[in-house]
Structures are given as structure tokens and as C-alpha cells.
């Protein structure tokens, strides 16, 4: 299964609370913080909600 590297590129200051919680649920705390997640529909949905705050790259296993 492929994996996704999610990196926070913009601050959550001024973002709506739902987006702040989604970024935290992805494991991101600050700008340039990265986490690797399995490529699942649930993770893709979370990324879609905060796509203006994060950058996504595919990672080969």
C-alpha cells in the first residue's frame, strides 16, 4: 500500500476550529512538520479539508 507524506506549510492561526482539529488529527503541530500516513480514503478526506494548509507527496515503500 502506498503512503503519503503530509507537511504543514501554512499556520492554523486564523483557521476555523474544524480545520485546526483536522491538522492536529493528521499529527501536525507546526509549519514544516511532516508525518507519513497510509493512503486511505479517510486520510485523503482529511487532507482535502485542509489542502490549503498542507502539502502532500507520495512516498514509495
UniProtKB/Swiss-Prot annotation:
Belongs to the universal ribosomal protein uL30 family. CDD domains: Ribosomal_L30 (cd01658). GO terms for molecular function: structural constituent of ribosome. The keyword Cytoplasm does not apply. It comes from the Bacteria. Part of the 50S ribosomal subunit. One of its GO terms (biological process) is translation. Signal peptide: none annotated. This is Large ribosomal subunit protein uL30. One of its GO terms (cellular component) is cytosolic large ribosomal subunit. Keywords: Ribonucleoprotein, Ribosomal protein. InterPro entries: Ribo_uL30_ferredoxin-like_sf, Ribosomal_uL30_bac-type, Ribosomal_uL30_ferredoxin-like. PANTHER family: LARGE RIBOSOMAL SUBUNIT PROTEIN UL30M, MITOCHONDRIAL RIBOSOMAL PROTEIN L30. It comes from Rubrobacter xylanophilus (strain DSM 9941 / JCM 11954 / NBRC 16129 / PRD-1).
Amino acid at each position: 500500500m502506498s503512503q503519503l507524506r503530509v507537511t504543514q506549510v501554512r499556520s492554523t492561526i486564523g483557521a476555523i476550529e474544524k480545520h485546526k482539529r483536522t491538522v492536529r488529527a493528521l499529527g501536525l503541530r507546526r509549519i514544516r512538520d511532516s508525518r507519513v500516513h497510509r493512503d486511505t480514503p479517510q486520510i485523503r478526506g482529511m487532507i482535502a479539508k485542509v489542502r490549503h494548509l498542507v502539502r502532500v507527496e507520495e512516498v514509495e515503500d
